[in-house]
């Protein structure tokens, strides 16, 4: 379905759900403490467009210059796995990617690269997601990831099930990288967020599914070159039939965004948010606890310094 047909379908069926009750912000932050005077560990934003929510969130963390230094080579790694238009929430929102790339250059980045190891045909995914055009508009280079020759072997000495992997050369060759997943349902992992987005930097994804998916997701996150920042796109959420989705009825317009250097914390906050769209207890998303056990982050967001932001007075009600 192309974008024109999708919009016609939504107009007729009202399938893309939206909400208008302020309880959504309480759900977003019901277990999160207020930030104190220092830069927060995690920022949760609701009620704006993807790019404006990111601008507000990154400013709360001290600006992009806290994470990207002049002259650095930067990778921005979205989820571009599926041949889907943005309205179907299969991939990271292109407006968010464009803004992040722009801010990387504003912070002095020498080069910004965008890529993902897609599931559908990579050229169709890059085009129809809108991410290729958005990234290039902001000045980024868009790299393919469909050939094994793009990947180099690394060791994962801290991994339990996965002890080695082939990782895309863009990650290995950059100075810093920013992880930008979309929050959505996943048939195997139950949720795909920042940690699972690492499967898009490796060549052999089949290994994950054959050797304890939830543990392997945590294992790949032990790689030495960790993302300096994790930005979770929760503007639209695929609540069912993920990761690919079937129709607009799978999508909820939530207008949320989570951002943190702590990958386990940001995924825990996003998972709590998703749980208000569709019941998804944290213990069913096993890679979160596995990641905490490997000491790559914390699930105990109650002890973190968290900033919560409302950007408007009207929200989407998330209780299905």
Where does each model-flagged region fall?
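N-terminal and secondary-structure boundary signal
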Residues: 1-318
């Amino acid at each position: 379905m192309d974008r024109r047909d999708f919009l016609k379908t939504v107009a007729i069926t009202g399938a893309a759900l939206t909400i208008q009750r302020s309880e959504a912000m309480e759900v977003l932050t019901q277990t999160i403490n207020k930030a104190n005077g220092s830069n927060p560990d995690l920022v949760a934003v609701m009620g704006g467009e993807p790019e404006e929510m990111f601008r507000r969130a990154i400013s709360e963390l001290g600006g992009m210059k806290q994470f990207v230094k002049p002259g650095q080579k930067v990778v921005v790694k979205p989820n571009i796995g599926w041949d889907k238009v943005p309205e179907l929430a299969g991939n990271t929102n292109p407006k968010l990617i464009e803004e992040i790339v722009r801010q990387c250059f504003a912070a002095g980045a020498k080069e910004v690269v965008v890529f993902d190891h897609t599931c559908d045909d990579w050229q169709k995914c890059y085009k129809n997601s809108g991410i290729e055009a958005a990234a290039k508009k902001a000045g980024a280079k868009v790299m393919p990831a469909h050939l094994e020759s793009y990947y180099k072997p690394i060791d994962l000495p801290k991994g339990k099930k996965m002890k080695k992997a082939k990782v895309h050369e863009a990650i290995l060759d950059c100075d810093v990288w920013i992880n930008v997943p979309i929050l959505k349902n996943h048939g195997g992992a139950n949720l795909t967020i920042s940690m699972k987005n690492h499967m898009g930097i490796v060549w052999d994804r089949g290994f994950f599914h054959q050797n304890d998916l939830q543990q392997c997701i945590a294992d790949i996150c032990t790689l030495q070159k960790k993302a300096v920042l994790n930005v979770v796109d929760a503007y639209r959420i695929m609540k069912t039939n993920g990761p690919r989705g079937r129709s607009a009825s799978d999508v909820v317009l939530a207008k949320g965004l989570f951002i943190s250097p702590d990958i386990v914390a940001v995924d825990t906050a996003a998972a709590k948010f998703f749980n208000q769209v569709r019941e998804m207890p944290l213990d069913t998303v096993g890679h979160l606890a596995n990641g905490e056990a490997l000491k790559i982050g914390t699930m105990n967001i109650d002890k973190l310094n968290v900033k919560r932001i409302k950007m408007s007075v009207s929200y989407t009600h998330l209780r299905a």
